[in-house]
Amino acid sequence: MKKVILSLALGTFGLGMAEFGIMGVLTELAHNVGISIPAAGHMISYYALGVVVGAPIIALFSSRYSLKHILLFLVALCVIGNAMFTLSSSYLMLAIGRLVSGFPHGAFFGVGAIVLSKIIKPGKVTAAVAGMVSGMTVANLLGIPLGTYLSQEFSWRYTFLLIAVFNIAVMASVYFWVPDIRDEAKGNLREQFHFLRSPAPWLIFAATMFGNAGVFAWFSYVKPYMMFIS
């Protein structure tokens, strides 16, 4: 069981690197590609768009394929998206790379939680999910500074090349450590949004939207702000 949790935690670490790593390389990216810093900041939004679009769509396939195969597909998208971003030299291709790399983000957390709920004893599921999510925290503590260092010493492309290669290792860990199980629950896209008929979810959405907007409005441009304004 520990290997399953570790595999999923490695996956969330890679997702955290991809999501937040862009913030530490924003100025280098803008200079290298020949776009403005605000335009480079759009890459953060494209990733977020991929997260929003990807999660509900992937959920539709949770009953058609094994959860292990879905996880492998999601991590493969991480590899492809970050590789595309690494090799891109135009705004359009950068945007597509970020969109693809963001697509599996929300779905990975959801599918990973389902896997853990099926193989972990009921009283320990919460701790197991926390272990999976800890990969994101470690990415913020260790991964992002490493990515920023690589960008400053070599190139921002090395940062995202590292993320792509790391996700290949994540695919191997999922293949060997995650059991081949299925989620038999049936559903369709419309059913996923039935809960929006009540006002309570909209209040939660508003709170999280404005809260995250406040954080990311500062966090996204913290490097150019510290370099050119403070």
Question: Could you say what each language-model-derived stretch is?
Answer:
Residues L6, G81-M84, L92-V100:
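Paired small-residue
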Residues A55-S66:
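Helix-to-loop junctions at the C-terminal end of transmembrane segments
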Residues H69-A83:
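Structural signature of the two symmetry-related core transmembrane helices
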Residues M93, P122-F176, Y221, Y225:
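Helix-loop-helix hairpin linking two adjacent transmembrane segments in secondary transporters
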Residues G97-G135:
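Cytoplasmic helix-loop-helix junction between adjacent transmembrane helices
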